[in-house]
């Protein structure tokens, strides 16, 4: 079984290292205020869209927006030089 959370985080970390010019992820990871603010704003925006999809009972959109929330949250973790393992350990502690 694959581990999509770790795999996605690995891609984000790769973009952080290589900073490809036309990468959306790299633009969010830019070492400037614009990049940091953009990633934080996207977490809020996508969380709002997730909540609205839940309110509307739209399960397809809920899955889509949930994935967007998780992706942007992982970008913020990478910005903060955290590893996805810290998040997974916290989740594991809550079981």
Swiss-Prot record:
This protein's pathway: Amino-acid biosynthesis; L-histidine biosynthesis; L-histidine from 5-phospho-alpha-D-ribose 1-diphosphate: step 2/9
Subcellular location: Cytoplasm
CDD domains referenced in this protein's UniProt entry, alphabetically: NTP-PPase_HisIE_like
Entry keyword set: Amino-acid biosynthesis, ATP-binding, Cytoplasm, Histidine biosynthesis, Hydrolase, Nucleotide-binding
Pfam families attached to this UniProt entry: PRA-PH (PF01503)
UniProt xrefs under InterPro entries: HisE, PRib-ATP_PPHydrolase-like
Main location: cytoplasm
GO terms classed as biological process: L-histidine biosynthetic process
Domain of life: Archaea
UniProt name for this protein: Phosphoribosyl-ATP pyrophosphatase
Annotated source species: Halobacterium salinarum (strain ATCC 700922 / JCM 11081 / NRC-1)
Lineage: Archaea, Methanobacteriati, Methanobacteriota, Stenosarchaea group, Halobacteria
